[in-house]
Amino acid sequence: GTTTDTGRKTAEAIIQANPDIDSLIVAGGGGDVLVGANAAIEALGLVGKVQTVSTDFLPDLDVKLENGTMAAESGGHYADPFFAFLLVYNAIKGNYEVPTDGFYEMLFPYMFVDSPESYANYAQYFTGTELPYYSDEIAELADMDFDALNKACAALSVEDVVARHAK
């Protein structure tokens, strides 16, 4: 199963089998596996020596980035439901033709954080009281054709939101 204990035991086994390890990618299983892997690295005294990255944001990610337990993180699947909704909404509005023998493909970006500051910005604009887009920006997105909407989706990042909100 994907538990904290499994994550810890797996990380310990990987580290033991690879004593010169300098990085670890923890993926799958939600945050529990990552919590266990971090516990193993901390218990073995390898914080800052083994750079860990993952795709599961933890509630204490800012602390883990600050103390060197985590090197970077991607995640924050905000774009998935938001842009999926906009695709359907724009199709209903007639902003672009709906194919009957194909589909539109939009690749949703993961959010990336690699410092306590970038995580604080993510928390503020993606999980806090502020949203990544202001209401006027959402109205603009709702009027875009597919290519423009796809470009807006691809541009979404923590840095993009911070820059737009700073205006």
Q: Predicted segments — roles?
A:
Residues R8-D22, L44-Q51, S74-Y78, E97-Y104, ...:
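Short, Lys/Arg-enriched charge-dense amphipathic segments
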Residues Q51-P116:
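Flexible loop/turn connectors
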Residues L87-K167:
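Hinge/cleft segment of the Venus flytrap/periplasmic-binding protein
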Residues T2-V63, F85:
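Hydrophobic alpha-helical
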Residues Q16-A17, M70, A166:
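Extracytoplasmic/cell-surface-exposed regions of Actinobacterial cell-envelope-associated
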